[in-house]
UniProtKB/Swiss-Prot annotation:
Gene: kdpA2
Family to which the UniProt record says this protein belongs: Belongs to the KdpA family.
Keyword Cell membrane annotated: yes
Molecular function GO labels: P-type potassium transmembrane transporter activity; potassium ion binding
Presence of keyword Ion transport: yes
Organism whose genome encodes this protein: Staphylococcus aureus (strain N315)
Listed name of the protein: Potassium-transporting ATPase potassium-binding subunit 2
Gene Ontology CC: membrane raft; plasma membrane
Record's subunit section: The system is composed of three essential subunits: KdpA, KdpB and KdpC.
Length: 558
């Protein structure tokens, strides 16, 4: 019942926040301008930008330039952190390969971690690299999504200004929301301090080091920005990062809030601020139905437990790798949310999930469109929508069109490329991991689960998720460089292609939609969309899943 109430709260808050995002995205005057306008003007002056409208190519150029600059500075800081201030625990510099991986990970909103924050980062890099990139990577994804929606919905004749979009989103959304979440987490017991690690003497007389630091400020944006990287190596399974039952719900809801709101924002941009277009509601329904299906699947297999243990007379569900304060139910919920919304934070160890329970987060990342991350999740779903409309139109002998814009050969080539990037990166690099000498030495499990570890690592990297089957010994040159490359390619190639798709569509003459066109405003469309998503991904990844989690499940029952 608590999960049902939680999901109802998610839907209601998404509806409310989407109205606020409408005002932010379209520069609608509001009473709070008196607070935020001076801050934004100061930022524009500091970075020396003029608020001129950009073309699609200019927008993407500045998006890539801004990200490249942030990545370069972050990379340097990680290489010299031991010689800088705010390093009370005297942590050393990261190696070149690890610094590259960390930079690529947080720059792309992935937050894959091949390090433990308490031993491999100073407080300076935790704040000025990790937390900073959590804000800017989330804002970058939001900005390109809003630029895409502006042109797609015909709300404006221009794509907007990249620097204005990220500034308004950070100042008006991320910072205020993150501040509220931080204060709540502090009230629950999450530390926020610049003091060094605490050394205590236990009851048995042994000295123990307790790692803490500026955690609450990182935890809030970690979830709100669908980032996922933890201050500590064990992430949100630790009592400091996620102290209570209520903090667990707050962190889960934070992950879902903005991606869910963006779908309704799309509907408001198609209609009015106070009304949501039925097409966006049908997209939300499709996403939500798939989310519920995967959640129920994960819950079922985790509560079913391990058949090998059952044969030994040990009954009960699968509690391995889970915190007793959360149990199986909240662990499965968190697992499904963190991979559906491509956050990557964990409150339990995914490597300890049952084979088919662990396949749920893997498949959600393979789909990469069940809500997804900040901005890019909706962009990915719109690619599936266009594919569905195109195929359905051809099946009934109609000219493929979307929102009154014809989908022709040029657009379909770009759509196909955008769709293929994700599976190609996963499958090619997974194959390389078994071919390159020494790469498979990182595997800690033989047979099917070893395949699952490799597949999960590259799926997580390509989906900009960041969670992992952490039995993999991944802090090696091969794994640092290969996953770093995957994260960068999977982030930037689809975004560029998706902006090109929309730019191509809006340059066409729009026409009045007819009743003979494929209907996109009813539950039938939602059903067909779900079927196409499952079929396309199933045909792509099923052979690999047979070699991994499905094979492992069959082995348990052998």
């Amino acid at each position: 019942m608590s999960i049902v109430l939680f999901l109802i709260v998610f839907i209601l808050l998404s509806l409310i926040v989407s109205r606020y995002l409408y005002s932010v995205a379209l520069n609608v005057p509001s009473k709070i301008d008196v607070v935020f306008n001076p801050i934004e003007k100061l930022i524009y002056q500091l970075i020396g930008t003029k608020l001129e409208h950009m073309s699609g190519k200019t927008y993407i150029k500045h998006f890539l330039l801004f990200n490249g600059l942030m990545g370069g500075l972050s990379f340097v800081l990680l290489l010299i952190q031991q010689w800088l201030f705010l390093n009370p625990n005297h942590n050393l510099n990261q190696s070149v390969s690890l610094a590259f991986n960390t930079m690529a990970s947080f720059l792309t909103n992935t937050n894959l971690q091949h390090y433990a924050g308490e031993t491999d980062l100073s407080y300076l890099t935790q704040m000025c690299v990790i937390t900073f990139l959590m804000f800017t990577s989330a804002a970058s994804g939001y900005a390109v999504c809003i630029a895409m929606l502006r042109r797609l919905t015909g709300m404006t004749d221009v794509i907007g200004n990249f620097y204005q979009d990220i500034t308004r989103f950070i100042v008006r959304v991320l910072i205020p929301f993150a501040l509220i979440i931080s204060l709540f987490l502090i009230s629950q017991g999450t530390p926020q301090t610049l003091k060094g690690n605490l050394v205590i003497e236990t009851l048995s007389g042994v000295k123990q080091t307790i790692a803490y630091g500026p955690m609450a400020s990182l935890e809030s944006i970690k979830h709100l920005g669908t980032n996922g990287g933890g201050f500590l190596g064990a992430n949100s399974s630790t009592p400091f990062e996620n102290p209570t039952y209520w903090s667990n719900y707050a962190e889960a809801l934070s992950m879902m809030l903005i991606p869910g709101s963006l779908v309704f924002l799309f509907g408001r941009m198609l209609k009015t601020k106070l009304q949501i277009h039925p097409h966006a509601i049908m997209i939300f329904v499709a996403m939500f139905v798939m989310f519920i299906g995967f959640l129920v699947t994960c819950l079922y297999f985790e509560f079913a437990g391990n058949p090998v243990l059952h044969h030994l007379g040990i009954a009960g569900g699968n509690m391995e790798g889970k915190e007793t304060r959360f149990g199986i139910g909240l662990s499965a919920l968190f697992t499904t949310i963190t991979t559906a919304f491509t956050t990557g934070t964990v409150n339990n160890m995914h490597d300890s999930l049952t084979p088919l329970g662990g396949m749920v987060p893997m498949v959600l990342m393979m789909l990469n469109a069940v809500f997804g991350g900040e901005g890019v999740g909706l962009m990915n779903m719109l690619i599936y929508v266009m594919l569905t409309v195109f195929i359905c139109s051809l099946m009934i002998g109609k000219t493929p069109s979307y929102l009154g814009m014809k989908i022709e050969g040029k657009e379909m080539k770009l759509i196909a490329l955008s769709f293929l990037v994700h599976p190609l990166l996963i499958l090619v690099f997974s194959a390389l991991a078994f071919i390159v000498p020494g790469a498979s030495d990182a595997l800690t499990n033989p047979q099917f689960h070893g395949v699952s570890q490799v597949l999960y690592e590259f799926t997580s990297s390509s989906a900009n998720n960041g969670s992992g089957f952490e039995g993999l010994g991944d802090n090696t040159v091969f794994w640092n460089i290969s996953t770093g490359i995957v994260m960068l390619l999977a982030r930037y190639i689809p975004i560029v292609l998706q902006i090109l798709i929309v730019s191509s569509l809006v340059n066409k003459k729009t026409y009045q939609q007819h009743t003979q066109d494929v209907p996109i405003n009813n539950l039938f469309f939602s059903s067909v969309l779900i079927i196409f998503i499952i079929l396309l991904s199933g045909l792509t990844f099923l052979p690999d899943l047979m070699l991994g989690p499905i094979g492992e499940q069959l082995l348990l029952h052998a």
